[in-house]
């Protein structure tokens, strides 16, 4: 059997004991498929439900296919929709009208080892993870219809996270930030975000806990944020937010048994396992199922999106800090995982405040499944691995 590794520019013929490895290095994509699957030049990996693949031992995939114990927590059942419920702007889920159009709140959250486990994941509509300073990553959790009793630890702003918050005209909650974010980006985008910086007089929603050391102990919650929105005169709701295309769940019979995804970061491996019954992906951090300490729920996503984006270093704005800068305005490669399938396509963000849109290989916008959206921004060249069940 002949196998090929695709680098995005050329193919190399190799032999790996009957297992075909398909790689697109330029897009940062590595897919493991059975012989007889997609392997022709220019083709994209198969997304056929029910496709099977083998666990293998390979230098390219060290320990990535080891089974993980089942989670101790199961996803909580959704509330029964009322007759007046409508679709939420951010994730397309059904919610009461006052929540479905509530002012989005984008909160910067720490990913230092001392900050884990973080709170708020299970209540967020959209979660972004991207490289930040010091070789660490950082999150911005965007809330709309969900209510969180704890969110945090809250950390500082970065310009590219501001651009993501600006997509939703969101309140942007953070503890300070780098010079470019505070002096250049945020003032220029005040028409598209509402700034709530603890270090600049906006401290009403934040508190520190005694069980963690600074700077990993600042928290907020939905109730405190809503109180501050009223106090600062910000609008409680929006009616005309830009929205993505959404679709309803596929029938159970059309969903594959499972799918596994691995997204490596410098701070650890993020992985997802598709759950056929709930049509969602259970999230793991460092090989362990992630539970939200705010409510004990297993963290899950209905959609997992990987954005391959250029990461450079800014050594000019703040000499000596050498902060990473993620180029999230423009266009690039993307993989959209939903309902146990993988769609290889393109992301496009036309401006600092424009919504990031996702397109398939034919140029059509990709409709997402209604519910939580987790967006993993990784440097171009990152090997993102996935396996069908």
At which residue positions do the language-model features occur?
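Hydrophobic single-pass membrane-insertion segments
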Residues: 27-42
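N-terminal Sec-pathway targeting helices
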Residues: 5-19
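Intrinsically disordered, low-complexity segments enriched in small/polar and acidic residues
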Residues: 41-47, 54-57
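A surface/extracellular/periplasmic glyco- and lipid-processing/surface-interacting theme
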Residues: 2, 11, 50-56, 65-71, ...
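Hydrophobic membrane-insertion alpha-helices, especially the h-region
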Residues: 16-28
